[in-house]
Amino acid sequence: MNIPERISALRALMEERGYDVYMVPTDDFHQSEYVGDHFKVREYITGFTGSAGTAVFTKDEAGLWTDGRYFLQADQQLAGTGVKLYKMGEPGVPTVEEFIASALPEGGTLGFDGRVVAIEEGAALEEAVASKDAKINYSEDLVGEVWTDRPALSEKPAFALGEEYTGESTESKLARVREAMKKAGADVHVIAALDDVCWITNLRGDDVDFFPLLLSYAVITMDEMKLYIDERKLNDDMKADLAKNNITIHPYNAIYEDIKNLDTASTVLVDPNRLNYALFNNIPGGTKVVQQVNPTIAMKAKKNDVEIRNIINAHKKDAVAMTKWMYWLKTNIGKIEITELSAAAKLETLRKEQEGYLWQSFEPICASGEHAAIVHYEPTPETDVPLTQNGLFLTDTGGGYLEGSTDISRTFAFGELTQQMKEDFTTVLQCNFNLAHAVFLEGTTGYNLDVLARMPAWRRGINFNHGTGHDVGYLMNIHEASCGFRCAIREKEQAPLMAGLVITDEPGIYIEGSHGVRTENELLVRKGPKNEYGQFLYFEPITYVPIDLDAIIPEMLTDQEREQLNEYHKKVYEIVAPH
């Protein structure tokens, strides 16, 4: 079936089951940003492959809501499907909830699979339908019924990380989580976020492409942890280690029934953005519930000394591979045919030469020419093109190593560039350095500093429609949720920057139909001086890959910026030259 046929089949089921509006989010059962093949339901029904977006269907309308990273991509992928693009945050564009409220008839029914909707979003939908005296049915996955050849859940095995990589035992992590539970007044903590479960157990898996995560849930009490997982993923040594910490193993889906049997005298801690609506609604009525951010988010964001040492080593390895790749690209462009996909394949070959390399840490972005204006463009056999011999090649890639994950963007210059390309490249470098050299007091948030990265672009009347940076997980999610750099305030994401945090600095400029530039380094937050004003913090760049000097206009740089660039390249040379 093509996309219009799939939508027609969905509408037939909506009519049969009595749904007036049906919503299809991106998430899996764990509110993951990136999902395994089994959970790519929104992609199946719309054809849009981006990592963020929500589809809504009525009897005669279909819409997809996504953010600024994906406007160009969605516009192209939705063409001919009958699905209308709604650009989130743009003037005059209704929110998903506003659209649903207007589309529902009085007394109508909104449907969705409650396992792929977070508690907080479910509450917002309850408010939306209340205005029409409508009801919600969250018990059916209608698209799953249409998708007859849907991939099965992953059955890939888990692997364990020793303390030489994690720097902390499961016993210690559980003790810290239980202490946080006490502070919250809770004696039960229900966790669905895959990276939180993996962090606590020091286990990793391969259930989501590029992300070493295990499909699992956890319920933690003061004396036990129940791990809900396909037991076949665990070997005997893992089971024995879990048992030492009184972690019992239960079938993956059994949590939905087990939650119904919680003691109503208990107090349950849940994260409204990281636990699904269906699971939440299975908590017995009358049970006290505390809704707050999972304590593990801050715990895993602050890297310990062992993790920091390992992460820096991973970046040194990655720098060797990236620098070899840069040399290969610059010396072979125009001599042999290099396409977006073949360039990405060459980089992975070079990364595989590094000890401890596992796999790419996310789908590589290798975008030549006008493709680079699509913020998260990922080449496919259908879109793959030869690299332009006169223009820019934007790359955003990463490697997953036993010592940690990397995330790096470099834009390479080939042949003759236009003046605007050079100006944009130089401006992005200024944006990157302006943020990277900030010194700030403890308690400062990413919101406070984001303007530093945007100011050089804003002075030219240019903006980039995405966040400037995100914190990075230790061989888990490449995007972690504790904080980030962005100018659009999100009420729930205002955690301060703290020593031990690893965060990206990735400004960009994107010119539709022409080119795109992004320069990204990872930054480690370090402690600086402490005095009567408080504890000062600063950033240490831990990405050690050359910036392409062929695209820079030196006259645009201040003396200080030139000195910063030279100092950065001196550090890069010291690390990479021996290899």
Whereabouts are the PLM-identified features?
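Active-site neighborhoods and metal-handling regions in enzymes and metal-associated proteins
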Residues: 1-579
